[in-house]
Amino acid sequence: MPIVPLRGIELYYESHGHRGDPTVLVHGSLTDSSGWARVLPGLARGVSVLTYDRRGYGRSTPGPRPTPVRTDAEDLAALLEATDFYPVHLVGHSYGAAVALRLASERPDLVRSLALHEPPYVGLLADRPATAEFGRTFLAAIDPIAAQVAAGAAAAAARTVVDAFSVRPGAWDRLPEAARRTGAAAMDRWVEEYRDGEALRPDPAGLRETLVPVLLTVGEESPAFLREISALLAADLPNATLRSIPGTGHTPQLSAPDPYVGLLLSFLLERNVPQS
């Protein structure tokens, strides 16, 4: 199984499919690259896919802590260069979307396009009068969740987080047992990620300068705050399209893999470079 040593850590990655443009899937919080399993077969029929575990997740080593979003973006750049797998289409889910957008802003030479599902830029809400109260309330909830994790109640903290990102009650309980174990084990990383101000507030200049095509997707059943964040991004990014996915919420790769794959491939294949 491929492991690449870089920047003092080891990143685990897998390759799927051998046709079409290089495409990298960047997972979010409380999961790892295995969370893409339901969309991989469909995507690999149209594009060449690389999945990987971000540092501190799955089979990748953690390195020094904490890990800000810029470190995740630098890791991804190093992985692309080490595997000679670029320029790429980046598909990012949740926090992974923030990593992907950060890389596109800092290393546009590596990125061909972005497909981002509900990046959790809660700081955007806190910075705008109409949504400031919700944004501040969300940010204020991070410390109590961190206290739960520090007290050894990671599973309870993970339940709070997962349920907050769903409009239907019991989202945590509907997850497979393996996914709940993975989520609880990753709660310390979640705390780091959501305490990183750069991760929750994209640089306005960086948004204006991100010129690659961007597909922003939201779930019709996602909480209003996540849909609002993506709408704000769509207005700020110069070359963005916003699409809604019916019958799903924050995790379309789990709950609506076929519609999600169809939307992604429609976007990606329009931008494929013909093979010589």
Locate the predicted segments by residue.
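Catalytic active-site module of serine/aspartate enzymes centered on a nucleophile-bearing elbow/loop
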Residues: 238-276
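Active-site loop/oxyanion-hole signature of alpha/beta-hydrolase fold enzymes
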Residues: 38-41, 50-95, 259-265
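Helix-rich cap/lid subdomain of alpha/beta-hydrolase
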Residues: 119, 123-178, 194
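Active-site loop/turn elements of alpha/beta-hydrolase fold enzymes
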Residues: 54, 119, 247
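The conserved beta1-alpha1 loop
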Residues: 24-28, 93, 218
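Conserved hydrolase catalytic core segment
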Residues: 86-125
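Conserved serine/cysteine hydrolase catalytic core
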Residues: 179-235, 244
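Conserved HGGG/HGGXW glycine-rich cap/lid loop of the alpha/beta-hydrolase fold
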Residues: 2-65, 79
